[in-house]
Amino acid sequence: MKHLVVNIGDIQAANDLPFVLFGGMNVLESRDLAMRICEHYVTVTEKLGIPYVFKASFDKANRSSIHSYRGPGLDEGMKIFSELKAQFGVKVITDVHEAGQAQSVADVVDVIQLPAFLARQTDLVEAMARTGAVINVKKPQFISPGQVGNIVDKFREAGNHQVILCDRGSNFGYDNLVVDMLGFNVMKQVSGGCPVIFDVTHALQTRDPFGAASGGRRAQVSELARAGMAVGIAGLFIEAHPDPANAKCDGPSALPIAKLEPFLRQMKAIDELVKSFPELDTGH
């Protein structure tokens, strides 16, 4: 199978290279908390030798409730990201929700993310593509893995070939998600070998059909992440928090940050083992 390499500065992401970590917090809750969380991730990933990109949202524009916390907004968010980059020398990924935000965000961060709910919005895709930034495409829960090829084609037609794909599960009936482990290879194939990242945090989400906030299955994060890493992928997407019960968004799915190092040790061991095996051509 062909493996494309996407360069995030000096970090190389590919399905046959050591895995890259996209990790941080769901949404920027405060400057100080972002600094604490980023410092912890940087310390652990440097210790373990894992290439790392800090993740947070400056605006959660798709919250279920009008009363839910959204974030500090574009201007303050970019200030915080700039400070994190200066303080820790870290790469940053964040999501873009409107075409008019794309260039302003790409001027600051290293990877811009296309949200799952917006992944078929052509105007947004084209605006993001024109920035020339590395793109992380969240596969929508409501499309099959094979359909991501159409999204990748839009970016390429707009002149951007630096595309990473990210799976966060698929709808399984109402208010539930499952992860199709066979889908990772389908995404690789239909994209011509794009790096595939597994967003284990959001794959753990559950919904109360009458509630305003997401639930989660944090207790199953290790099992699900181990299964995904065993397929052989380019990276893992994991959010952590020092106090998940009081996180302002998706706390029930967040990894307690004190568990980050032992968690990543397991992921690194699986990744190294799987990628030490030769690829077997078993036909089509």
Swiss-Prot record:
UniProt keyword list: Cytoplasm, Lipopolysaccharide biosynthesis, Transferase
Taxonomic superkingdom: Bacteria
One GO cellular component, as annotated: cytoplasm
Localization per record: Cytoplasm
GO biological process terms, semicolon-separated: keto-3-deoxy-D-manno-octulosonic acid biosynthetic process
Pathway field: Carbohydrate biosynthesis; 3-deoxy-D-manno-octulosonate biosynthesis; 3-deoxy-D-manno-octulosonate from D-ribulose 5-phosphate: step 2/3; Bacterial outer membrane biogenesis; lipopolysaccharide biosynthesis
Family per record: Belongs to the KdsA family.
Cross-referenced NCBIfam families: KDO8P_synth, PRK05198.1, PRK12457.1
Name of the protein: 2-dehydro-3-deoxyphosphooctonate aldolase
Gene of this entry: kdsA
